[in-house]
């Protein structure tokens, strides 16, 4: 479901892209160090965004360096290392475990079961380190699975379940910034859930699988459906942006530039691609 919280690359200078790459590569290395190859398989732009956001908010000391890795053995790449990349790696591993388990339960993919089993020994330590976040993950994913299994098309309930999950991930500490971070994560989580449904509509329809937007697609003409989806996505990103603006993050800092780019431009990149592809197919 992750992979929608990306940059608008044309809006950034080379130095800013290097800074982003440092966090992304840093998260990959941290996942490898803490969870091995299975953890690295779950690497996402979304959790790199969480690390950048929290680093900027808490002004966390960060070590930057360069180095080679197995996927990129020839050219050195920028790397970042700090405690919030450790946190993002922990959240990535926990979410990956539940995702692999869900894939196994839904489709009986043996590869997914094997990956879940590799991460399972890490769960007790994760629950001990982050009890609030892990408890919320379990509760909200159970809630989401129950809604989807029942064939619910209550978009508010579906979006709120995933939004509450991501909101708790954003709330690194239970401090003065936690309400804004939770609100931001709620809006972004709802956007991600809707965007995933929007992206997968045709595939889910072919396979006879649940899709939160299927009823809307069945009830509305194509143009009205597209307009309504855009309205829903805009509403959720508006909630996210409103809460983001309450945080003391300066737009002209290196991390601030990446965050503003992502929230106001980058998240719409995949939407634009999916909509363009769908409209092209419609006119073939």
Regions found by a protein language model. Give the residues of each.
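Acidic catalytic motifs of isoprenoid enzymes
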Residues: 1-183, 190, 194-234, 238, ...
């Amino acid at each position: 479901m992750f992979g929608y919280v990306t940059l608008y690359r044309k809006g950034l200078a080379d130095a800013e892209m290097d800074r982003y790459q440092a966090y992304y590569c840093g998260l990959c290395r941290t996942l490898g160090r803490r969870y091995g190859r299975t953890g690295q398989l779950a690497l996402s732009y979304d959790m790199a965004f969480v690390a950048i956001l929290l680093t900027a908010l808490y002004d966390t000391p960060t070590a930057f360096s360069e180095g080679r890795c197995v996927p990129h053995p020839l050219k050195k790449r920028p790397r970042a290392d700090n405690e919030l990349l450790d946190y993002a790696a922990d959240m990535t591993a926990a979410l990956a475990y539940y995702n692999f388990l869900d894939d196994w339960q839904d489709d009986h993919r043996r590869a997914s079961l094997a990956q879940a089993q590799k991460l399972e020994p890490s769960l007790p330590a994760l629950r001990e380190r982050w009890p609030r976040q892990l408890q919320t993950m379990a509760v909200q994913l159970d809630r989401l699975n129950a809604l989807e299994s029942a064939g619910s098309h209550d978009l508010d309930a579906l979006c709120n379940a995933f939004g509450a999950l991501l909101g708790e991930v954003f709330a690194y500490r239970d401090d003065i910034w936690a309400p804004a971070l939770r609100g931001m994560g709620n809006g972004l989580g709802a956007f991600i859930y809707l965007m995933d449904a929007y992206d997968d509509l045709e595939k889910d329809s072919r396979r006879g699988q649940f899709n939160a937007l299927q009823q809307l697609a069945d009830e509305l003409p194509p143009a009205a459906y597209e307009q309504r989806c855009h309205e829903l996505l805009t509403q959720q990103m508006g909630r996210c942006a409103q809460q983001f603006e309450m945080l003391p993050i300066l737009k002209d800092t290196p991390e601030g530039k990446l965050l503003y780019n992502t929230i106001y431009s980058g998240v719409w990149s995949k939407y634009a691609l999916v909509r363009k592809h769908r409209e092209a197919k419609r006119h073939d």
